[in-house]
Amino acid sequence: QYINGQLVDVALVGSVEIKPSVSKILVKGDKYIPNVADLSYWAWPTKKPYTITTYYQYRWGAFHAAIDIYVGFGSPIYAANNGTIADVGSGCVRGDTKCNNGRGNYIIINHNIGGYYTQYMHLNSINVRKGQTVSRGQKIATMGNTGYVVPTPAYGSSSYAGTHLDFGVWIGVPYGGGTHINPFSLY
């Protein structure tokens, strides 16, 4: 009913159900994460500021096929780009220099384009699982000192000795026929 052009009273004369209601949540917080890297932009794998303790170079008579980055024990490690977790090595404790062939706790990400892989070694904790899709900048682990690190966190010394991230970039599967490249070539 209208009075002087204003609606003043409404009466429901009927209703039609267009779509039945659903009494459950069908989708909660779904976000599509592409598993293919954007080769034009790579995220740095640690927070800043950081210190490079070893470069991609020869040392101690052998080639070091990665860069060692120090921020601090337990600091976050981030995926350098989108991809799929290709391998995870875990179960290592500080001081076990042979665990996972000296790599300690580690993650390898397949970036699913151009054969690019990144490796993250000597981790304290791991936040991902094999087969999981990750996005650039996503926290995947924390910095640690597992596996063969120098100085070794030996009994009676600092339990944080040798803390760093060994960050490597490969074209092809790391340690499986791939070729390592200088990580700085991406930045």
Regions found by a protein language model. Give the residues of each.
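Generic structural signal for well-ordered beta-strand positions
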Residues: 8-9, 86, 140
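Bulky hydrophobic/aromatic "packing anchor" residues in well-ordered structure
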Residues: 51-53, 69, 183
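A generic structural motif
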Residues: 2-3, 70, 110-112, 170-172
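Zn2+-dependent peptidoglycan hydrolase active-site motif and core
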Residues: 64-66, 79-127, 146-165
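Generic structural motif
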Residues: 44-54, 75-87, 134-137
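Acidic, glycine-rich catalytic/binding loops that coordinate metals and/or anionic ligands
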Residues: 14, 40-44, 126-138, 142, ...
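Well-ordered beta-sheet/strand-loop patches within structured domains
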Residues: 1-56, 63
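Short, small/polar residue-rich loop motifs at catalytic or cofactor-binding pockets
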Residues: 72-73, 127
